A protein has these predicted regions:
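Conserved SGNH/GDSL esterase-like catalytic core that processes O-acyl groups on lipids
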Residues: 2-4, 10-98
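Alpha-helical cap/lid subdomain in secreted, periplasmic
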Residues: 67-206, 219
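Conserved catalytic region of serine esterases and O-acyltransferases that act on ester linkages
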Residues: 187-251
Length: 251
């Protein structure tokens, strides 16, 4: 299976372990991520219309191997799956999606007519505390949701569902999994001293956050629930909690 993500650092988070996790479960998945930090649907579309080769091309969760445009990426290989997503700072603002999501989907299907299209539902920011341990960007964006994690979750989920339906794509519900882990499992609830699933207030933690995203992608795209017995040097008990939460996810 070959996957292309037209994304940013949030798809970078999701891709980090996906290739390796798939291999550990007897599957071959090769991923390509088109990375510009914080890139929105609007910016992706502008880059297409100007044919800008400004994306870092990252294979299988690794470092960038060069610069490329979206069109170059789409014609350079045949993909089974192409994913789209909105930038996190706009993920819960519905008017930021149009007309760019439809334009992007049509462009992808023009060059990859056999590929299945998925929309990557991203996740909320960490709960706000004062004084905040996070920076100004976190503060500025989270203010759009009144520093309310539940409000941000509901808005970005509503937007993801609308966007996916609009372009006839399936959802990869990473945001719902992260929200469930934070709310329903003490081991990942920061209020009870659990592991924080973010490393800076918005990007996923380098261990369990990124593992959760990869596991959700693997299950959504292949139907295979990963074996949590061992991965990297992570705690198998925590991996089990993440994996056991995945089949329960509904949007």
């Amino acid at each position: 299976m070959k996957i292309l993500s037209i994304g940013n650092s949030f798809s970078q988070d999701a891709h980090k372990y996906l290739h390796k996790l798939a291999a550990a479960n007897g599957l071959e998945i090769n991923t390509a991520n088109l990375y510009i930090g914080g890139c929105s649907l609007e910016q992706h579309w502008q880059n297409i219309t100007a044919d800008r080769a400004e994306y870092d091309l990252e294979y299988n969760g690794g470092e960038a191997v060069g610069k490329i445009s979206i069109q170059q990426a789409l014609i350079s290989d045949r993909y089974d799956i192409v994913t789209l997503q909105q930038a996190s700072h706009l993920s819960g603002i519905l008017e930021s999606y149009d007309p760019y999501i439809a334009n992007l989907a049509a462009f992808v299907r023009k060059y990859q007519p056999r590929a299945k299209l998925y929309f990557h539902q991203t996740w909320t920011y960490e709960k706000f505390t004062e004084p905040s341990p996070y920076g100004n960007y976190y503060r500025q964006v989270f203010a759009n949701y009144d520093f309310d994690q539940e409000k941000m979750y509901q808005q970005l989920t509503d937007c993801a569902c609308v966007a996916a339906a609009q372009i006839n794509a399936k959802l990869i519900p990473v945001g719902t999994l992260i929200h469930k882990l934070r709310e329903a499992t003490p081991e990942f609830n920061q209020n009870t001293g659990g592991h924080v699933l973010s490393r800076d207030g918005y990007h996923l933690s380098l261990d369990y956050g990124r593992f959760a995203a990869a596991a959700m992608w693997l299950y959504t795209l292949t139907g295979v629930l990963p074996k949590p017995e061992s991965f990297e040097d992570f705690d198998p008990a925590l991996l089990r909690i993440i994996v056991d939460s995945i089949p329960e996810i509904q949007i």
